[in-house]
Amino acid sequence: MSTEGDHVPQAEEVIETVEVVEEETGSSPLSVEDSLKEVLKRALVHDGLARGIREASKALDRRQAHLCVLCESCDQEAYVKLVEALCAESQTPLVKVADPKILGEWAGLCVLDRDGNARKVVGCSCVAVTDYGEDSVALQTLLSSFAA
């Protein structure tokens, strides 16, 4: 019985330490671009990305998408209008990214070398997030930027 009583204060001390660490990481805010990159990586791990205009438009039409990322330099104006209209209809937040290669890298459409650098990146015009995966500081930062 006395050993169980000793474990309870130690567990409380560990919880207090974790809370202090969370407060320290919360003090350095992530930029919207960094948080978007982190959210897309977590969604990719949890199989929650619809990559490409076809998959993304289907997810938006079914109202399964929680977030949509569109490339600004898309050469097909009809694609841009379609995605913007579907996002407006379902009130899905829309983020625009300048370069399709960056979006393709964030969506996992690349090959990583031994050092973890992206090679052979395929450009991507549109990505829809259907499952965020686990909750994170980056997700909260991104969602709060849409609320503002």
From Swiss-Prot:
Belongs to the eukaryotic ribosomal protein eS12 family. It comes from the Eukaryota. The lineage of its organism: Eukaryota, Fungi, Dikarya, Ascomycota, Taphrinomycotina. PROSITE patterns: RIBOSOMAL_S12E. GO terms for cellular component: cytosol; cytosolic small ribosomal subunit; nucleus. Component of the small ribosomal subunit (SSU). Mature yeast ribosomes consist of a small (40S) and a large (60S) subunit. The 40S small subunit contains 1 molecule of ribosomal RNA (18S rRNA) and at least 33 different proteins. The large 60S subunit contains 3 rRNA molecules (25S, 5.8S and 5S rRNA) and at least 46 different proteins. Its main location: cytoplasm. Component of the ribosome, a large ribonucleoprotein complex responsible for the synthesis of proteins in the cell. The small ribosomal subunit (SSU) binds messenger RNAs (mRNAs) and translates the encoded message by selecting cognate aminoacyl-transfer RNA (tRNA) molecules. The large subunit (LSU) contains the ribosomal catalytic site termed the peptidyl transferase center (PTC), which catalyzes the formation of peptide bonds, thereby polymerizing the amino acids delivered by tRNAs into a polypeptide chain. GO terms for biological process: cytoplasmic translation; maintenance of translational fidelity; ribosomal small subunit biogenesis. InterPro entries: Ribosomal_eL30-like_sf, Ribosomal_eL8/eL30/eS12/Gad45, Ribosomal_eS12, Ribosomal_eS12_CS. It holds the Pfam family Ribosomal_L7Ae. It comes from Schizosaccharomyces pombe (strain 972 / ATCC 24843) (Fission yeast). This is Small ribosomal subunit protein eS12B. There are 2 genes for eS12 in S.pombe. It is found in: Cytoplasm. One of its GO terms (molecular function) is structural constituent of ribosome. Keywords: Cytoplasm, Ribonucleoprotein, Ribosomal protein.
